[in-house]
Amino acid sequence: MKGSYKSRWVIVIVVVIAAIAAFWFWQGRNDSQSAAPGATKQAQQSPAGGRRGMRSGPLAPVQAATAVEQAVPRYLTGLGTITAANTVTVRSRVDGQLMALHFQEGQQVKAGDLLAEIDPSQFKVALAQAQGQLAKDKATLTNARRDLARYQQLAKTNLVSRQELDAQQALVSETEGTIKADEASVASAQLQLDWSRITAPVDGRVGLKQVDVGNQISSGDTTGIVVITQTHPIDLLFTLPESDIATVVQAQKAGKPLVVEAWDRTNSKKLSEGTLLSLDNQIDATTGTIKVKARFNNQDDALFPNQFVNARMLVDTEQNAVVIPTAALQMGNEGHFVWVLNSENKVSKHLVTPGIQDSQKVVIRAGISAGDRVVTDGIDRLTEGAKVEVVEAQSATTPEEKATSREYAKKGARS
């Protein structure tokens, strides 16, 4: 009894499910039949509409630029540090008390300008003593020469011996030697007095004072009084790979000074322009680089000692080069390529050979010609032969606007 009861319930459930399925089937069929006349009419009005609808849609928006022919400079770049043309630590040559400083920290000075004074009292005394001794010995010499003249007259009549005459002659010579020594002592004392006035040995900018007025200083002090850095002119020391040495040497042989530009740390602003001064005489075996020195007039004080800069040295200019924006150059499995637009705004891939390149533009040595249009933005979804819409680049866009534009380009390409 229990088995037949369960069988009946199973049959009932199956029948209910079948009835529901049949209802939904007939309902869907009626809906499709009612919609068919409209669809047929639309198909009659546009026989190829379905096929075109599968292929049509918004064209992918791209930005393009025209390849131009121009002269392109070739630069060698390196990282460098500004160094003073000369750095001098001003020290005292004599010992004594510092009486005065005659400079302002940071000011520009000329060679010979008075910087400091040491108490000259002791040097004046020493000079006076030397001058007094010189005067005394000169008087002695005068008297000795008079005696010699008398001895010479008396010797003619044999009133004095030859020995006495020779002794007087020796005394005169000895006194003459003493005079020379006295003159040297006077010169030395005068020099010591002169050194009590400390002057600038070179043109340049003085730094911070190293000692205050009133202190006792000596010629052995290593810190000195002040440091002068010569910044007019000023030098730039940077490095280049050893592979660039031949290029630099060849450019030097052309006979023209090589222009070197100093750019700021971010490489966005040119600070100054100078010329190549020299190459080092050996390569650093550890880094495989060579040191290069350039000199700048720096009259505007744009460069400062120990400042970090980016160096760019012009070594050549390539004439009649085909140039495109760097953004147009792409890299694929087959090598470098660009997307070229024809007169119908259809794109095709062209393999190219790039040359000189920077962040803004690149020289194309082979693959395209001047006048060809290349895609610079919206490249992501391009396919061979696809037709695109060329839009103008906005003069100023925010990062959010650029992101929106790229997203729109992707959506258009997908369509």
From Swiss-Prot:
This protein's GO CC annotations: efflux pump complex; plasma membrane
Induction record: The mdtABC operon is transcriptionally activated by BaeR.
Disulfide cysteine pairs (residue numbers): none
One term of GO molecular function: efflux transmembrane transporter activity
Alphabetical list of Pfam families matching this protein: HlyD_D23 (PF16576)
Presence of the UniProt keyword Cell inner membrane in the record: yes
Compartment(s): Cell inner membrane
Bias (Basic and acidic residues): 399-415
InterPro entries: CusB_D23, Multidrug-R_MdtA, RND_pump_MFP
Residues spanning the signal sequence: 1-21
Key words, A-Z: Cell inner membrane, Cell membrane, Membrane, Signal, Transport
Mode of membrane association: Peripheral membrane protein
Top-level taxon of origin: Bacteria
Record keyword Secreted present: no
Location of the region described as Disordered in the Swiss-Prot/TrEMBL record: 31-60, 392-415
Residue spans of biased composition, Polar residues class: 31-47
Subunit structure, interactors included: Part of a tripartite efflux system composed of MdtA, MdtB and MdtC.
Function: The MdtABC tripartite complex confers resistance against novobiocin and deoxycholate.
Family per similarity comment: Belongs to the membrane fusion protein (MFP) (TC 8.A.1) family.
PANTHER family according to UniProt: MULTIDRUG RESISTANCE PROTEIN MDTA
Protein name per its UniProtKB record: Multidrug resistance protein MdtA
Species assigned in the record: Escherichia coli O157:H7
Lineage: Bacteria, Pseudomonadati, Pseudomonadota, Gammaproteobacteria, Enterobacterales
Gene name, Swiss-Prot/TrEMBL: mdtA
